[in-house]
Amino acid sequence: MDYVNLGASGLKVSRIALGMMTFGTPEWRPWVIEEEAARPIVRRAVELGINLFDTADMYSAGRSEEITGRLLREFARRDEIVIATKVYFPVDLAFKGGNAPGPKPERRPNMSGLSRKRIFAAIDASLARLGTDYVDLYQIHRFDPDTPVEETMEALHDVVRAGKARYIGASSMWAWQFAKMQHVAERNGLTKFVSMQNHYNLVYREEEREMIPFCRDQGVGLLPWSPLARGFLAGNRAKDDATAGATARAKTDEIALKFYYQEGDFAIVDALSALAAARGVSNAQIAYAWLAGRPGVTAPIVGASKVWQIEEAVRALDVKLSAEEIAQLEAPYRPHPVLGHA
């Protein structure tokens, strides 16, 4: 496993991150697996040299953080791993996240967002669930239009100064919003973000327009989520019936229907499949190799419900694509509506 700096920071992270959203309770999402099924996956990830583990307080309403903390204490030393979590959404099983379908329950005051009150309460609750006295990377899950940017950045700075987080990161927002937050931090001598966790894969490349160039210019590391487009790039959907998934997640993941399956998306999967067959590797490995090789990308966040899936992702780091192969994969792309910021 190779290790690289997270953006312009001195923090060394593996070229693959294990996403912990898959681990928790099926009460939250039907495709989530419980702790016993997660145990061998986390153990294997540590054995393979993965040191970056990404979760969030809202995943399974805190259950993901609890599992993350217990399994990492079982299989790794605290000083050898990088724990990342997030704040913004309500921590309640009734709330599935900003992109989840269906009616949204009424939010109670201060149960979400990025106010000083919310951030201070959320970091303490996350640390308790994780069973640690600090997180390495504390990320804001979304931009909060209801809280002054100055208030949010000062609160995050105080979390770092209190020793409860080593670095801060952000996720899924417009480039102008992220630039504004970084500017406020710099102007006021506050802690700046070292990472951006954004929606980026072969069938969703809208981040290449503004966010990625900005991050590369400013030394912000990219930690893309959904590198396989929720399994689509691995082949979990058929063109003739995109609503009939081939995996447990595909059969129940209504968010994917909102994000993907345009006509051009299937053309990308066809190009991906042809190249994978020619190279003698899986579709997923080609998709990971393309993403890991994009300028500015530090580590794709890989979700896994089986051990072989994390092994496959790590092997993908050895797959090097030529300029001609990259062009072959990218040629069918068509613009998409901007999705993932809600």
Regions of interest found by a model, annotated:
Residues 71-78, 128-131, 160, 182-191:
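Acidic (Asp/Glu)-rich catalytic clusters
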Residues 144-331:
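Beta/alpha (TIM)-barrel catalytic core signal, keyed to glycine-rich beta->alpha loops juxtaposed to Asp/Glu
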Residues 23-36, 105-120, 146:
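Active-site mouth loops of central-metabolism enzymes
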Residues 32-45, 113-129, 178-182:
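Short, acidic/polar
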Residues 18, 55, 85, 137-140, ...:
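Conserved beta-strand positions
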